[in-house]
Amino acid sequence: MGRFIFVRVGLLVVFLSLSGTGADFDCPPDWSAYDQHCYKAFDEPKRSGDAEKFCTQQANGGHLVSIESVEEAEFVAQLISENIKTSADYVWIGLWNQRKAPYCVSKWTDGSSVIYKNVIERFIKNCFGLEKETNYRTWFNLSCGDDYPFVCKSPA
């Protein structure tokens, strides 16, 4: 009887420790779960548009990563640090400038609006990446034609 209670309590502790970590999300193999989304960092450098197209082909609803909070930014930075091994100075995210006269409007490639911002430079180019020098925590305005690793995000 004592062993049975110990096992039940042990299983309950494991279940509670996993709740909220994304362990219950249905992500593809080798993808990481966070807040009802799946993420994967890809080490193969691509141009921003090619990386976006690649992400849409990897998972239903997939796009280059959109970052909507400080907590998500920390998660993505950790994911990149653990999975990107190239010496690239930047990693693509899904933020693009959409030039509509007389303004420049930034949007995520998944269509969502920008509600959290962490930009280090003026918006003079059309694409954005996370900068290695800031441990992938700051957004940097980049030329879309450059080749960098990237992170994809899809609904879980």
Curated annotation (Swiss-Prot):
It comes from the Eukaryota. Residues 34-153 form the C-type lectin domain. Gene3D superfamilies: Mannose-Binding Protein A, subunit A (3.10.100.10). Keywords: Disulfide bond, Glycoprotein, Hemostasis impairing toxin, Secreted, Signal, Toxin. Glycans are attached at residue 141. The keyword Cell inner membrane does not apply. Expressed by the venom gland. The keyword DNA repair does not apply. Residues 1-23 form the signal peptide. GO terms for molecular function: toxin activity. It is found in: Secreted. Belongs to the snaclec family. Heterodimer; disulfide-linked. Interferes with one step of hemostasis (modulation of platelet aggregation, or coagulation cascade, for example). This is Snaclec A14. It comes from Macrovipera lebetinus.
